[in-house]
Amino acid sequence: MKNLLKRYVSIKNIIKVIELDFFANLKLRYYKLAMKLFKIEDEKFDEILLKAGMNAVSSTYLPVVFLTSIILGLIIFIIFLIVFNIFYAIFGLIGGIFIVILIGVLYPYVLAEEKAKSIDENLPYAFAFISALSSANIPVVEIFTSLSKEDIYGGMSKEAKEIVKDTKVFNYDIITTFLRRARITPSKKLSSVYYNIVASLIVGAEMKNIFHEIYERLMEDRKLELFEAIEKVEILSEFYVIACGMIPLFVVMTVPVASSISAILQTASLFGDPKLLPLTFYLWVPIASIIFMGLVYGILPKDFKLNVSLLDVLKEFDEPEIEGIKMKFKWKPVHFITLFFWMLSIISFMLFFIRKSIFKFHGTDFLMFGILFLILPFILTSYWHFIIENQKERYYPIFLNDLTMAVRSGMDIIRAMQVCARTNYGPLTKIVKKMAIQMSWGRPVNEVFADLERTEKSLIAKRIASILKECAVSGGDVKDILTSVTVHAYKLSEMKREISARQFIYVVVIYLSFFLYIGTSYIMVHSLLPTLLKNIHGLSVEFYKNYLFQGILIYSIFSGASLGILTERSIIAGIKHILLMLIVGYMLFKFYIGG
């Protein structure tokens, strides 16, 4: 039986090899045909292909693009000729050829631009890593070898891999390697940095000082770029307040006024059509909010993003697991809170079904409460995770400072970690104690920091952990590396505080527009609408009141989510704003405006 199985596997592998050879030969023949039909070569395009990291040259790539465009154009021509007529077929042929050529030519430019963006976003943080390791007098090639293993640095990690390949595989010297990468890299900023490094190497400057100066300059540049991004977001925020705050108010005020005038003059009016209200609240506000969130998410950089996912939240409700083995289930506070809210949810659904009214709350109110209480544990848990990760970020600089001071006093890193484990670092305390215990048991320090890098959700924490891990592996002067990391952590913390301070004003503006909406609703329901709708048949104050109430709920949800994206680049961060606006808006409408 085993022999039969081995034969089956070997036959299967032979078939795979034959298939691969067949497709490889077919691909080669296709390339040869394209190059024979179209002899095109462009040096500038060769440069773009190189910067995009595509293993191709213009004399091969462009002919393949042109031949592919003609083949696809002919296929479209035949299909359109059968389905439509000769006019559509010719149009499809020309259009198909043009679109394929356009995509084929633009693709390397887009790829190069994406690579440049990834490099520029990670450049200052990669040089924080390089500067920290160079402070321990680690050779330049070894520093870039360490950087090449850290995927969290995105495009810079790939650049480091290319440098390592050139020096260790192709045996280029370090100066030739940097000069070559300066010409090839798609990032103009990195190209300039490479030339600075080469100049420093030629004159024999001390590299740790050069790397530190480059890091300082790059951090200042990144800070300016972040502030420029915030300025763009500030402009978008002003448009958002107008689009989702002022325009709905304008529609709400205009429709009854226009309806009243139309009734008096006995003429139809577009602005007096009540259908504008559902269009405004159900379409305009959600679409405008989603567009705003998409634009802000695209503009704001990922420098301080917290990767809190739904999977992390669901783990809180699951049985604990260690290396695939299910442990005994233990009740946690989150389980009791969930049970409490679900009991409230069941009571709310029961009140809805028996049509019971309590105070000013009716059937539909209890239905909404039931749904809210059902999902509230997951919402609150996800936000709790977000708060914990945010607080851990704030304590990292303090922890690193204490660790550095302990090491500088003469302790080794294991003893220093045990001393730090006695200090209170808020949510970070548990992690510090865990690391100290693992180190005291004899686990390698680099493995402990590697675990920290893998488990942390914050990019800031991951970058710090990556430097600490390499610090343990490199065997350099730990004191200098820790000092460099601590300074870097404080700089990041300060930068994040400055950005948050600038964004706070727009949080206030969006809240003001929310309360303005509630205030306007109160005036309309109690003063304006009863007078205007007195002589209009088919429309009542209750009709407008329902739309105003729904408008508050919709505005609360989308404005809260927008604030989360605006402040922390995460909808989870907007949960507190959503809940606050929903509760305040709901209660004010029910008890003061009338629901």
Curated annotation (Swiss-Prot):
Q: Which Pfam families match?
A: T2SSF (PF00482)
| Record's keyword annotation contains Transmembrane helix | yes
Name the domain of life this protein comes from: Archaea
State the annotated membrane topology for this chain: Multi-pass membrane protein
Matching InterPro entries: ArlJ-like, T2SS_GspF_dom, T2SS_GspF_sf
Where does the UniProt annotation locate this protein? Answer: Cell membrane
Q: Which cysteines are joined by disulfide bonds?
A: none
Q: Does the keyword Cell membrane apply?
A: yes
Please provide the record's keywords in A-Z order.
Cell membrane, Membrane, Transmembrane, Transmembrane helix
State which residue ranges cross the membrane.
Answer: 64-84, 86-106, 239-259, 281-301, 334-354, 368-388, 504-524, 547-567, 571-591
This one is known as Uncharacterized protein MJ1286
Per the record, the similarity remark reads: To M.jannaschii FlaJ.
| Species in which this protein is naturally found | Methanocaldococcus jannaschii (strain ATCC 43067 / DSM 2661 / JAL-1 / JCM 10045 / NBRC 100440) (Methanococcus jannaschii)
- GO (cellular component) term, any one: plasma membrane
